[in-house]
Each structure stands twice: as C-alpha cells, then as structure tokens.
C-alpha cells in the first residue's frame, strides 16, 4: 500500500485571475475575487449575497493574481513538468475557465514581446535550450497540432485542415489519432512555424465577451525522443510526450452571444466553423452547445476520478476526454490552470470554475518513464542513417580503388630500374597507401568529408579523362569513320554512366545529411563555461521555486495547526471569559455551518440547472428524432428502409452508427460486377418487345421499351367571316348577346363520326398554304365589329 501511494501523484491545480477589462470598468462592475498568493487561496464574494453571508474560500497549489507575470507561472509551475518530459515522462498542461478569462493568453500569450510569451513558446525555448546543453545524447523532436471542433478532430497543419480524422485505440500504445501529421523540428524557429501555421486555420470567432474567442479545443503535441548510451554499452531510448491544451471557454448564450457588429465572426478550419458576421449567429449556438457538452463530459470524468465510490470513468462521452485519458488518472503528470474573471457579472461562472478546479485536486495519476518503446522514430532514424552511411563509405572506397588503379598505371610506367614490373609494383604501391592510411586515420566527421571530396575529385578526373579521349579520337585521322563513331559512342556511354553514378551519389549524400541534421546532438558548438553558468542559474531558479512552494505549504499547515491549538487551550480565568471565548467559537462554527448550507444549496441549484439543460437537450434530440421518423415513414419505401437497417452497425471505438459496405471487404474489388439478367449479352437492358422484334427481323434500335409512337394530326387554322347586323335601333346588349351566340354555335359544330389518326401538320401529305398578309388582315377585320354604336 505504501508503494502504491508513493507511485501516485496528485494532479497539480493553480488558479490565475485576469485584471478588469475596460469594458467592465466602464459598465461599473466591481471586483469580487481576492487572491492570497502566499497562502495559495482564492476568496470569492457573492455580490448578491444576503447580509452576514461569508465569502467562499478555495485553496490550490499556487495562485497568481492580476499582477503576475508569464515567466512566474512558467518557472514555478510548468518548468518542472517540462523537465520531467525531457526525462521520458508524459506531461499535460491545460487551461480551463469561462470564455474571455485569458486561457489562450496563458497558453500562447503574445509572441512578439518576450515578457508576454505564454506556456507554449516558453516550453519551446526550454526544450531546445536543454538539448543544446546536454552531453552525449541524441534527440528527435516532433510536433503535431490538432483541434476538436464540434466533436470532430481536425489536423491544423495538414494540407486538408477540414478533413475529419478518426480516433483509434491500441492496447499497447493507448489512444491515438489515425493519419495525424507530425513534423520533425530542429530548432525553435521551425516549431514556432508549425504553431503559427496551425493558428491560421484554427476556428475562432467574435462574441460579446471576447473579440477573438476560441471555438474549438486545440492540442499542441510535442514528442521528445532521447537516445543515450547506458552502462551496458547499448543505446537506450526515452520518449516523453507533452500535451499543451487550450480549451474553449464554457459560456452561456445570453452572455456570450454572437457579436454581429464585429465584422467577420469566424475563421473556420477548412469547410467548418461558420460564415461571416451574418452567419455567425446561426453557428454560435451550435458551437457553444458542443463546447459545453465536451466540458461537461470533462467535468463528469473529473468528478468520477475524484470520488472513491465510482467504478466507471466515462472517458468515451467525448473526444476530448478520450484524448486526455492518460492525463486524467493515467500515467502522465498533469497541471490544470483555472482562469478566472474578477468582475461581479461573472460570479456564477467563476464559482463553477473554482469548484471544478477544487474537485480536480483529488485526482491521482501514476506517472512512469517511457523507456525503450517499440515504435520510436529515433531508432528508425538511427538505423536508416547507419545504412546510408555504409552505402556512402562503400561508394567512397570504390572510388578510392578506382583512383588507385589509375595512379598505379602512372607509377608502373615510370618505375625505377631494379624493380619488377607489372602487378608487383601495383601491389607494393597499394600496400604502401594502405599503411599510410592506417597510420593517419582521420576522425569520423573528417573521414566523411574526405570520402565526399575523394569521390568528387575522382568523378571530375574521370570526366576530364573521357573528354580528352573523345577529343583525341576525333582528332585521330588514321581511324575509319565507322570505328571513330563506335569509339565515340562507347565514350559517350561511359560518360553518361559516370553522370548517373554522380547523381546517385549526390542524392544518397543529400539524404544522409538531411536525416542526420534532424537528429539533435547536445553539446556541439556550445561553450562549456556558458553551459555551466546557465545550468547553475537553472538550478538556482528551480530551488527558489521549490522553496516558495514549501513555504506556501508550511503556512497553510501552520494555519490549520493554529486553529487546532486554539481549540485545545481551555484555561480560563473566569466564567465570563469562558463564555466570551465559547460564544466567539460558537459564532465561528455557526458561520461555518451557514457556509456549508449555502454550499449545499448552491450545489443543489447547480444540479437543477444542469438537469434542466440536459432535459432541454434531450427534448431537442427527441424532436429531431420524431421529424426524421416522420420523413422515413412517409417518403422512404419499407423495402428500402429494411435494406438500410440491415446494413447499420455500431462502431464502439467512435460511438457512431455506420453502414456496412455493399461489397464485402474480402471479395476481389478488381473483379468486374456481373450485369443484370435482363441484359445478358447486350450493352444495355432490352425489353421483351424489342427481343421479339429482333427475332422477327425488324430493326430494334430505338425500341428499348414497349412504347407506341403515334403521329399527331393538327387541322389547319380555319378562317371564317361573321355577319353582324347594322341595325342602329337595336339594343346594344341584345346585339352583343347575338354575337356571342353565333360564336358559340360555330365553336360547337358537330365533329365527324369518323375517327382519324392524329397527324401533325408537318407530317400531313398536303400542307395548308401559309396565310398571306392580305388574308390575315381580312380575317382580323372580319373578327372586329364593323358597326359603331351611337348612343346620342
């Protein structure tokens, strides 16, 4: 039991309060938060409290007020965690709080001003400074940047930032993200470039409480792999992972609604995140709902971990809790920074944040060193570099041997008298050169440079020699033209082979140098004296931070013991003094009782509010479900619905329903699908009528279906004349009725009893003559009334 307690480590919680903003000061909001930096206490006063109600006090590992600096937070709280990551532990730093309380400022800060840099840029400087000061160690640093936007995981530094990534789980390595891009970085500038590239595509928006509000949870992952030679003579690799989490703020829609006057409302990632200022109002409720649901799931996980009775930890309720599974109750060291707003209108949110942080203090993690894992990229790099180096050395030795042969030829020609000729001289020269090389063997980097130079010199010499031989062949007039052409082709081929060999060697050398440059080796090109001074300063800074922490813990312990001592002292000089002391103690206990009752009432109110929110969300989902059921029942045939229902299955890893593929995965996808039975042997389906027509011999080209083609028969337009009476004494109404009756009698003339086949005028054998202009005018004149009624 003792070993188990020793191996566990509590989650470290610190609180930070921002100053009042200009908008809050102009609105007349008062400050309700008091920070005691020495004791690590936060006191929250209720602006709507009744007379005599005591303020609420919370105690944390460290407290930073509005006057605190970014360097203070990093040096005292975060630096020991990053040192642990460099030793092979997993570490997580995440900021939690209401929107507009300074989470992004705490994690990122202002990149231009060094004093206002946040946790992430300070961690960059810390990691690469440590690597440059280390000795006899090789490092590989990788960086990834992702966000969780509306419960979708997106890669911020990918070429397709809007692509949705899948969350997977491996029994050996734990939870991981499939196809997440990772960049190998060699210095602070490169890793800052990865960070800036991801910030350009992260979802942000403007609300009433914050002009640049984070609309997604962002996680910047730094993986540090270290290789060091152990006492057994073998290389041992440690892998540390640092998760830097910038959570989106919890918010209420009535306070943090969309800021329609702020111009662009969102800078979405890829295809998500909302539109401009007008469209932001529709996206903000969705974003806020997803943010609050994921933060609620995070709160449920912390509540389950802080309580001893819970046996089930709901990690799968959210993508955020799945990714932070190792950081919450796992094998990582974790720091939580609770950011607070001091204004009176943020009382409820500040109280909720303080309670959340107070529960998180009870979480226990069991950190361990990740030593010699199987999937280290550093080991793969080392093996690949060794293979490329062997190939380069082989090519260098080959060039050296070829160069020796050419030099031997020259020496053999000018051999002194008394020595044998031929291979003996060549062997003697080779042995002499080998002895000289063994006696004066250069160091490893000089050897690599020498090999490269020797290979380049050899290739250059061979090129010059081939060019000279080509020129000599062209100038030699004793050769026949065919022989000269053949020799020139051979020399040209040799020159082309030489060029290819040179290109292959250069490509191999470039690949070797590129991979070797990605490995960071500590202690190179750094002055030892400066290193020692920096190390001493670092140790002193850590000692000061540790001393402050111990002093704060001792003061908290002294306060508790003073209260216990006051209770134990029971000596009184008189009954009156005893009554006064006990009355004071009774009032103090009564105040504590009232504070506990108020806390219980607040918890009850919060429970009711959360329950109402859940009921509202459930009603909304039920309403949407009924609508979709109604659409399915009225617009989708039952057989199609059954086909869809038979293909559905639940993916337990992603907690989503998915469709099974129509073609089984085991089948050969390259095999052509069979045509339907109605089209066997034909290019397209053919009806039975067309098949019969084909059997009868008629042309079935346009007879794909049993459709009758009937010709239309349109009669030519009939022109008739209407006779009207010119009796001026007749009543105008009667005259008008007479005209209508004549027109009706013409329209209702009996049709012939013969049924004619319809035929269009263009298909009729005798087309009617086109009406002339005179006939048209005559017809129109006949239809117009020719009499003028005079009512005078």
Curated annotation (Swiss-Prot):
Q: Does the keyword Transmembrane apply?
A: no
The family database entries (InterPro entries) matched by this protein are listed as: Kinesin-like_fam, Kinesin_motor_CS, Kinesin_motor_dom, Kinesin_motor_dom_sf, P-loop_NTPase
Q: Mind listing the GO biological process terms from this record? A: microtubule-based movement; mitotic spindle assembly; spindle elongation
Compositional bias (Gly residues) spans? 269-282
Disulfide bonding pattern of the chain? none
Q: Which residues form a coiled coil?
A: 374-627
Xref: CDD domains? KISc_KIF3
User: One GO term of the cellular component aspect?
Assistant: nucleus
In residue numbers, the region (Globular) covers: 628-792
> Where does it reside?
Cytoplasm, Cytoskeleton
Provide the binding site for ATP.
97-104
Q: What residue spans carry the Basic residues bias annotation? A: 397-412
Give the matching SUPFAM superfamilies. P-loop containing nucleoside triphosphate hydrolases (SSF52540)
> GO molecular function terms here?
ATP binding; microtubule binding; plus-end-directed microtubule motor activity
A single Pfam family it belongs to is Kinesin
Every Kinesin motor domain range: 10-363
Listed A to Z, the keywords are: ATP-binding, Coiled coil, Cytoplasm, Cytoskeleton, Microtubule, Motor protein, Nucleotide-binding
Region of interest (Disordered), ranges: 249-287, 397-418, 749-792
Which residue windows does the record flag with biased composition (Low complexity)?
257-268, 773-792
Glycoprotein as a keyword of this entry, yes or no, is no
According to its UniProt entry, the function of this protein is described as: Microtubule-based anterograde translocator for membranous organelles.
Give the record's subunit note: Heterodimer of KIF3A and KIF3C.
Indicate the family of this protein.
Belongs to the TRAFAC class myosin-kinesin ATPase superfamily. Kinesin family. Kinesin II subfamily.
This chain's protein is named Kinesin-like protein KIF3C
The organism that produces this protein has a lineage beginning with: Eukaryota, Metazoa, Chordata, Craniata, Vertebrata
Gene encoding the protein: KIF3C
